[in-house]
Swiss-Prot record:
This is tRNA sulfurtransferase. Its main location: cytoplasm. GO terms for biological process: thiamine biosynthetic process; thiamine diphosphate biosynthetic process; thiazole biosynthetic process; tRNA 4-thiouridine biosynthesis. It comes from Thermoplasma acidophilum (strain ATCC 25905 / DSM 1728 / JCM 9062 / NBRC 15155 / AMRC-C165). It comes from the Archaea. InterPro entries: Rhodanese-like_dom (IPR001763), Rhodanese-like_dom_sf (IPR036873), Rossmann-like_a/b/a_fold (IPR014729), ThiI_AANH (IPR020536), ThiI_fer (IPR054173), THUMP_dom (IPR004114), THUMP_ThiI (IPR049962), tRNA_STrfase (IPR003720). Gene3D superfamilies: 3.30.2130.30, HUPs, Rhodanese-like domain. Belongs to the ThiI family.
Length: 481
């Protein structure tokens, strides 16, 4: 096992009682993370740091509350001569041909000063090095002395910072399978607040797959010791109300109000301190200042928007850095309601739209899962695998102009409302659209009626046909169920 000195930042600014509480939470999280992945770890507080003895340092990079850490070598040394000798044995070859600097921190009473230590170690290594550089050396040598223990290290590895997860109150976070919402959730977790998660499904269970993939990435890397509760709201009825029947005037904004209302109900019934969203000011039509005001009007719990001042490029960079950037995307579900986006709505406009929404029906469709149970439940895959089934009815959901420009041979162009109402249960249907979300919705609705249906995208089917014609894939048709 190796030894690591773990540093925190804000915890050290707390009063004694709160500091002790947060230190305990941090150490508990460290031990649990290692235990869950099958490794050993022990830790204790030492002079404003956490000393961790563990099998490797992988988890330390991902535990909220850790500002930085260093692999350290610990020795017992009572005199300046002992400290200098040990430092020379460790670092003489490491500094050969390189510039270096020495930094010493001490806790306790000693017969020498920190400056004495720095000078003595520097003198002992100087002749083997390329010289001393106290501004930007090739290697910094650190000697932290606590009583008669000396800790040597030369690496400082950054952690995520923030506060220990679980040290602040919990929130319910709105998460999709996209880029923004997992980042906003991570940012609140970094501030010490556990987040349970709400997903509003418009093509249940198809759109759960990319959502679960992103959540698992977030949890497995950053909080395997505190897995979230997942709430899934079946919102497929909104497609008929808002898109097919067109009963709402401000659909792109009203849809967000609906999600807020669902989250509010969950928050009030389960003791969450507020709602976390991935909205950024002005990024899309529903996120103008006026629309954000209209969306949250009447919501009775606080709403946190960690990304409010961030550019999209900044969010994408952070998603890649924290490992939640989605490999595949069906498109943001909000795009279904954005054919005529409204950029400046008023609260009373959305209040009027909400009269068309049966919120009680949506509330009844909320289900709660553990993330592992939800993963097991998603065994049914409605996406098309292999070739198009023989004699399948191919439905193109794109606009008429897109269909006339190019389409899959033998496909028929149908609007969303007609596609979900096909009558021939003896046929197999392959439904495609631009991003895969509308086709996934239709496939899930047809499956609910006992009709065999698969979904895909126009680009994916074009690629499959091209590969088939070139002989890169077999021409065997996928059998119908």
């Amino acid at each position: 096992m190796s030894l690591y000195m773990v540093r925190y930042s804000e915890i050290g600014l707390k009063g004694d009682r709160e500091r002790s509480r947060m230190e305990s939470i941090l150490m508990d999280n460290i031990r649990k993370y290692y235990e869950i992945i099958g490794l050993r770890a022990s830790c204790r507080i030492m002079s404003g740091h956490v000393l961790v003895e563990a099998d490797g340092d992988g988890p330390l990079r991902h535990i909220m509350g850790i500002k930085s850490y260093s692999p350290v070598l610990r020795f017992r040394a009572e005199t300046l001569e002992d400290i200098t000798r040990i430092a020379s044995e460790i670092y003489r070859e490491k500094v050969r041909g390189k510039t270096f600097g020495v930094r010493c921190n001490r806790t306790g009473t000693h017969s020498f000063t920190s400056l004495d230590v720095e000078r003595a170690i520097g003198d002992s290594l100087y002749d083997a090095s390329a010289g001393v550089n106290l501004k930007n050396p090739d290697i910094w040598i650190h000697a932290d002395i606590v009583g008669k223990d000396v800790f040597f290290y030369h690496e400082i590895i950054p952690g995520p910072g923030g506060l220990p997860l679980g040290s602040e109150g919990k929130y319910i976070s709105l998460v999709s399978g996209g880029i923004d919402s997992p980042v906003s959730t991570w940012m609140i977790m970094k501030r010490g607040s556990p987040c349970d998660i709400l997903f509003c499904s418009l093509s249940y269970p198809v759109d759960l797959r990319p959502f679960v993939d992103v959540v698992k990435k977030l949890v497995e890397r950053w909080a395997p010791y505190r897995k979230p509760r997942i709430y899934v709201a079946d919102c497929r009825s909104l497609i008929r109300t808002m898109v097919i029947e067109g009963r709402t005037k401000y659909s792109n904004v009203t849809f967000k109000r609906v999600i807020y209302r669902i989250a509010e109900k969950i928050a009030l019934e389960n003791g969450y301190n507020g709602i976390v969203t991935g909205e950024s000011l002005g990024q899309v039509s529903s996120q103008t200042a006026e629309n954000l005001k209209a969306i949250e009007s009447g919501i009775g719990v606080p709403i946190l928007r960690p990304l409010i001042g961030m550019d999209k490029d900044e969010v994408v960079d952070m998603a890649r850095r924290i490992g939640t950037f989605p490999e595949l995307s069906m498109g943001e579900f909000c795009s279904l309601f954005a054919s005529r986006p409204i950029i400046r709505s008023k609260p009373e406009d959305i209040d009027e739209d909400m009269k068309q929404i049966d919120m009680e029906e949506l509330f009844e469709g909320i289900r709660a899962y553990d993330i592992d149970d939800l993963s097991v439940a998603l065994r049914t895959d409605l996406s098309l695998k292999g070739s198009i089934p023989k004699d399948a009815v191919i439905i193109d959901l794109r606009s008429r102009s897109q269909y006339e420009k190019d389409h899959i041979p033998n496909s028929i162009n149908l609007p969303l409302g007609d596609a979900i109402n096909v009558e021939d249960k003896g046929r197999t249907y392959v439904v495609y659209c631009g991003m895969g979300l509308q086709s996934a919705y239709v496939a899930s609705m047809l499956r609910n009626r006992g009709i065999t249906a698969y979904y895909s995208t126009f680009s994916d089917l074009k690629k499959r046909l091209s590969e088939k014609e070139s002989g890169n894939i077999t021409g065997i048709d996928q059998p119908a169920e």
